[in-house]
C-alpha cells in the first residue's frame, strides 16, 4: 500500500472483512457508498452484489488476457486468482498424536481431532460456504448434512473470517482447519509449523476477484 501511494499519490484506507461481512456492509451502504474497490474473496458474493445493484462495471487494464470463465461478462468483477480449499494441520499436533496429515474428509472425524478443528461460519464466510459446496459434491445433499453433523462434534469454534482459522492452527490453538489455499500459504510463509494437504475425495475452488 505504501508503494502504491508513493507511485500514484493516492492514499488507501484498507479494511479486511469476511465476504459475508462485506456483502452486508454493501447492502447497508447502498444509498451512501463508503467503499471504492473490493479486492479479494470469492466471486459468489459479488454476483449477489451485482444482482442487487451494489457494484458498478469496470474493465481493468489487461483483463482481455484473462479467460472469459474467470470474469463477469459485463465487467462487474474480474478474477485475479484461483483458490482451492485445503487442509492445514499443526505439525506438533500430528507428531504428538502419531498422525499423518489428513488426506480425506473422513480423517477429521477421528477422535484425535475432538475439539481440535476450527472452521469458518457459513453465515459470514465465503470460505465456509465453499466448504459446504465441497461436502455436497462429495457426499450428496443429505450425505453432506449427515457428515457435517458428525464433523461438528470435533469443532472447537466457528469463526466469522475464513482466514483466521489458519492462524489459530499455526499458533497451535487448534489442530486443523479447512481454508482457502492462499490463506494456508500465508501461514507457511510466515514460518509456522503447519502442513498443507488435500482430501482425496476432492474439493471445489473459488475465483478470487476484484470489483
Per-region residue spans from a language model:
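Generic structural signal for residues in well-ordered beta-strands
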Residues: 12-14, 117, 194-196
Amino acid at each position: 500500500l505504501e508503494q502504491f501511494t508513493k507511485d500514484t499519490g493516492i492514499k488507501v484506507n484498507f479494511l479486511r472483512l469476511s465476504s459475508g461481512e462485506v456483502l452486508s456492509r454493501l447492502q447497508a451502504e447502498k444509498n451512501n457508498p463508503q467503499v471504492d474497490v473490493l479486492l479479494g474473496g470469492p466471486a459468489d458474493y459479488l454476483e449477489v452484489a451485482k444482482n442487487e445493484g451494489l457494484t458498478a462495471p469496470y474493465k481493468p487494464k489487461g483483463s482481455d488476457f484473462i479467460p472469459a470463465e474467470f470474469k463477469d461478462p459485463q465487467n462487474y468483477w474480474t478474477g485475479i486468482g484461483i483458490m482451492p480449499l485445503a487442509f492445514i494441520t499443526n505439525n506438533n499436533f500430528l507428531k504428538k498424536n502419531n498422525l499423518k496429515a489428513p488426506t480425506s474428509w473422513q480423517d477429521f472425524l477421528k477422535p484425535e481431532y475432538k475439539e481440535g478443528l476450527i472452521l469458518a461460519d457459513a453465515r459470514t464466510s465465503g470460505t465456509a460456504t465453499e466448504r459446504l459446496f465441497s461436502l455436497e459434491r462429495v457426499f450428496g445433499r443429505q450425505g453432506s448434512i449427515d457428515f457435517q453433523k458428525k464433523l461438528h462434534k470435533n469443532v472447537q469454534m466457528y469463526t466469522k473470517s475464513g482466514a483466521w482459522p489458519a492462524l489459530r492452527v499455526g499458533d497451535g490453538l487448534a489442530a486443523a482447519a479447512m481454508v482457502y489455499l492462499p490463506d494456508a500459504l500465508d501461514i507457511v510463509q510466515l514460518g509456522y509449523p503447519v502442513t498443507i494437504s488435500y482430501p482425496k475425495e476432492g474439493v471445489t475452488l473459488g475465483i478470487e476477484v476484484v470489483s
